[in-house]
């Protein structure tokens, strides 16, 4: 995104979540981009369906993992909190500040559980805390 100089193109890329136009069969609208990859960075670009199916790992189908290659070319599952550790730390730091400002006990509980969820990729408790909130004026997704 930082390399896009045209403000309209940058805004459109933000809306489209990338350089491909979702309303025009995912054709690239920026020069220098080819066909949109099927794997969208959740998997190695060169992975095949057969290779994925043969990959024996209990975490490979998790909603909270990406698949990467080891140095030897073999596949591995990487949890989001590991793959995106710098971003997760930043998110958690901001949420910790929000906890100190939260006046509603339900919101405070939710934020504390969400911080833990970001750190562990186990979101059930925070999702349940979200559903238990009744009076919060904040909608956080």
Label the predicted regions:
Residues 1-114:
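N-terminal helix-rich structural modules
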Residues 96, 129-131:
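Generic structural signal for short, flexible, solvent-exposed coil/loop and linker residues
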Residues 103, 107, 113-114, 118, ...:
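Acidic/polar surface patches and capping/hinge elements
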């Amino acid at each position: 995104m930082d390399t896009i100089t045209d403000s309209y193109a940058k805004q459109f890329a933000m809306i489209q979540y990338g350089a491909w136009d979702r309303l025009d069969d995912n054709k690239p609208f920026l020069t220098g981009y080819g066909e949109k990859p099927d794997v969208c960075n959740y998997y190695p670009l060169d992975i095949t369906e057969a290779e994925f199916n043969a990959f024996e790992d209990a975490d490979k189908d998790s909603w909270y993992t990406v698949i990467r290659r080891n140095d030897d070319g073999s596949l591995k599952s990487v949890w989001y909190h590991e793959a995106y550790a710098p971003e997760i730390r930043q998110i958690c730091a901001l949420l910790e500040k929000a906890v100190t400002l939260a006046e509603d006990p339900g919101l405070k509980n939710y934020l504390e559980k969400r911080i833990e969820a970001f750190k562990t990729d186990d979101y059930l408790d925070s999702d349940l805390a979200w559903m238990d909130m009744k009076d919060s004026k904040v909608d956080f997704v």
